A protein has these predicted regions:
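Glycine- and aromatic-enriched membrane alpha-helices
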Residues: 1-264
Length: 264
């Protein structure tokens, strides 16, 4: 929500009239709101309850998607842009996580890349002369015509697609070179050991970089890695370090309480 609040300044900073500013604030509100509701309804139907984390990503996706066209589209265009953004982030995360098996724990590709592409294309579909910022955009040469769905034909849509392909090609070439250099020098991925321990402690020497998420040790017994419980056919070296504490409950209850403390 801090991002959402800041997005009004991000999108509205260049406005020169109150009418243009009001229109930008409207579209910047409508698109993420619709994206959030769309994602909530979809995940509610699919999983039986709303996915809060996914819905918050949908809010950000709606903001990303509306940015390119925020000053040249109207509320109707913002609604459609938001609906697509809300669905796109869900299917994008599913595609990356479950089909392509790409490590993207925060859904950045689905939120920013996919919806950035969608938002860029949306200008060629929903740009309208009814928006206060349209005349300024035409005068400055930022756009050439109305969007396809507002009677402008394929002119602006073609320009938006050309812009997308150009940026994608430039980024792909440059970042491929950069990533190969990183891989050949300091390494591109964290080791398996670093992933298990956490990069906060390996890279920065911190138990956790987030307040409230530190490992709690007060009142807990020391757990040493010599105390190992072997489970199944795994070797002792690969077993989970643990301490098992057993305390009896009065005999009349006929049960035994077992507490297992594990340090991961």
């Amino acid at each position: 929500f801090i991002l959402w609040f800041g997005w009004y300044g991000f999108n509205g900073a260049a406005c020169t009239t109150i009418e243009d500013l009001g229109s930008v604030f409207l579209t910047t509100t409508v698109s993420p709101a619709i994206a959030t509701v769309t994602c909530m309804v979809f995940t509610w139907i699919k999983y039986g309850k709303p996915d809060v984390s996914m819905c918050l990503n949908a809010s950000l996706a709606g903001l990303v998607a509306i940015t390119a066209s925020c000053d040249v589209t109207d509320a109707a265009g913002a609604i459609v842009i938001g609906i697509v953004a809300g669905l796109l982030v869900v299917f994008g995360v599913w595609l990356l996580d479950y089909k392509l098996h790409i490590d993207d724990p925060v859904g950045a590709v689905a939120v920013h890349m996919m919806n950035g592409i969608w938002g860029t294309i949306a200008v060629g579909l929903f740009a309208t002369s009814k928006a206060p910022g349209y005349a300024i955009a035409i005068e400055s040469g930022a756009i050439k015509a109305e969007g396809l769905f507002y009677g402008g034909g394929f002119t602006q849509l073609g320009l938006q697609l050309l812009g997308f392909v150009s940026v994608a090609a430039w980024a792909a070439v440059c970042m491929t070179i950069v990533f190969f250099v990183i891989k050949a020098t300091i390494g591109l991925r964290a080791t398996e050991e670093e992933e298990i321990k956490g990069l906060d402690i390996c890279e920065h020497g911190l138990t956790s970089a987030y307040a409230g998420f530190e490992l709690g040790t007060a009142g807990m017994p020391d757990i040493t890695y010599e105390d190992v419980v072997s489970v199944g056919s795994e070797s002792m070296e690969n077993s989970v370090p643990a301490m098992i504490k057993t305390s009896d409950i009065p005999d009349e209850n006929k049960i035994t309480k077992v507490e297992i403390l594990m340090k991961q």
